[in-house]
Structure formats: C-alpha cells, structure tokens
A protein has these predicted regions:
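Short aromatic-hydrophobic micro-motifs that form the base-stacking/packing surface
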Residues: 52-56, 249, 271
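Nucleotide-activated donor-dependent transferases that construct or modify glycoconjugates
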Residues: 172-184
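Short amphipathic alpha-helix
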Residues: 190-200
Length: 281
C-alpha cells in the first residue's frame, strides 16, 4: 500500500507491509504490475526467489483457509502453472456489438439452467502462479487450473449491496433441529420445526433425523433444507461436533435426561419441545 494509515492498521495485526510506489497507485495501474513490484521487493529483502506467488484480496473476505490450502496443493502437479478461484456461473448470457449497435446471445440453444454447459466466473479471491510466470503485465502461465468455490466464499465486495451480503454471511448462526416423524408421534413435530426454519433463512440450518424413521426423512426431502441421519446418541453427538451448532432445537417428544446433560456439558444453547421426557423439567 502507499497509504500510511492502512499500513499502520495492518502492522498492528502483525502483517508485513510492502510500500507501494506512488506511480503504481493510480486507477489505471494493472494489479499485475503491483504484484510484480511487491514480489521483487520481498525477494530483495529475503535474498531469495519464491516458488509460487499468490494474490488474495480483502474484497473477498469470506475465503476459507482450507480453500487456499487446496489451491496450493494443486501445485504438486508440476504441469500446473496457475490456479484461479471460480464460482459456478451457468446462465443465458448476452453481449453487445458496439459496431452494429445490436445485442447478441452467447448461447446457441435456450436451455434450462441445469442443462446449460458448465461455465465459471472468476471470483477475484485467489490467483496463484509459479514465480517464472509473474511479470509486469501478467500473472498467468500456460496451463491453468481452476478451483471451484462456494457461492458464499465467492462474495466480492464492490458495492454496498455486496457488503450487506457479506455481513449476513458473517452473522449466520448454525442451528441444529433434532426432530422425527413416525406413526406413533405423527408429523406435527416435523412441520413445527419446518415452520420455524422458514423464518431462519439467513442462518445455517441442518435437520438431524433418526435414520430408522423413514417418514421424517421423506418429509424433509420434500423441502430445500440440509439434513443428516443418525443411528444413536453417540453418532448424533459426533455429528454435532462436526457441525458445531450454536443452537440445538430438540423436538422429538421424549428427550432423555442423559442426552441433555451431554449437550449441556458441551456448552450448546438448547431449546426443547417436550411432551413426556424428563428433560422438560
């Protein structure tokens, strides 16, 4: 950066700052040129050359470290020169011919989105390349691989709307619904939880259903919610450790006391809808 205030802020967080020359801080400056200059400065300080140069940007704040790891791992294949992060972008697209003043389709046949050929859009999150392909005008080699990321990770902040979207993702709460439906208890528990889940669309909701109760599985498959099945308490607790929910909502009618103690000891916030179990006391 050429900005002393930005440099001061990031240095407080332990970040090494590369001073950007003022002549490379214009709106017309290519990012390739900026990265090339920063790379040369760092190599001069280190008295060494890098093997791989990776560009990640603060405008893509939802990028996960494991995604960055996957991008780096791709370079184990020495045929790969560069790796770019992309997101699925299948759509019917149009262009505009300035010379003729006419719009034209980028597709040959109108199809449902699911039937369109796979196309991708660069996210701006990751652009990694081998050192020998980094120049003042390019950061791409000859053999380019793509790493497809989730729509959440692909959020790039360029507008206030993008900021709002990123903020909603960052404020998402993981919520687990433990619920069943079978002949003896009916379907009311399931539909009650589905009703609650419909008001939690901005959060990460997962249903946990006993795999021996096919009725509950059939119902949840009719809705667009994630779900996992389990066979017993220990397996369910293991799934919770993987998902790491902030809130667990139990609606099975007869929750065991021992199960509730296990959840409490692990620090989960618990909501119960009980009918006959001890855990409602």
């Amino acid at each position: 950066t050429e900005d002393s205030e930005i440099a001061s802020i990031v240095e407080k967080y332990g970040t090494s700052v590369v001073k950007r020359p003022v002549e490379l801080a214009t709106d017309e400056t290519l990012l390739d040129t900026v990265i090339y200059d920063a790379m040369l400065q760092k190599e001069k300080q280190a008295f060494d050359e890098y093997d791989i140069v990776i560009t990640i940007q603060p405008s893509s704040p939802l990028l996960k470290t494991e995604t960055l790891d996957k991008a780096i791992e791709k370079f184990a294949d020495f045929n790969i020169d560069s790796v770019i992060s992309v997101v699925d972008d299948k759509n019917l697209r149009w262009g505009f011919d300035d010379e003729n003043g006419r719009y034209f389709p980028f597709y040959s046949e109108r199809l449902y989105r699911d039937l369109l050929p796979k196309t991708f859009k660069e996210t701006g999150g990751i652009l990694a390349t081998r050192r020998n392909f980094v120049t003042e005008t390019s950061r791409l080699g000859l053999n380019i691989d793509l790493i497809e990321i989730s729509r959440e990770e692909s959020v790039e902040i360029n507008t206030y709307e993008d900021w709002w979207i990123a903020n909603n993702y960052l404020n998402k709460i993981k919520i687990a619904f433990v619920v069943d439906a079978y002949d003896q208890i009916g379907t009311g528990h399931m539909y009650r939880c589905l009703s609650m889940a419909s008001k939690l669309v901005f959060h990460d909701v997962v249903f946990f259903i006993n795999r021996t109760h096919q009725l509950g599985i059939d119902i949840i498959e009719g809705y667009n919610y994630k779900y996992q099945t389990y066979g017993g308490k220990s397996e369910l607790l293991g799934l919770f450790e993987q998902f790491d929910p902030k809130i667990i909502i139990n609606d099975v009618g007869n929750t065991s006391y021992e199960y509730m103690v296990d959840l409490t000891n692990k620090g989960y916030y618990i909501i119960n809808s009980e009918e006959i179990g001890r855990a409602h006391v």
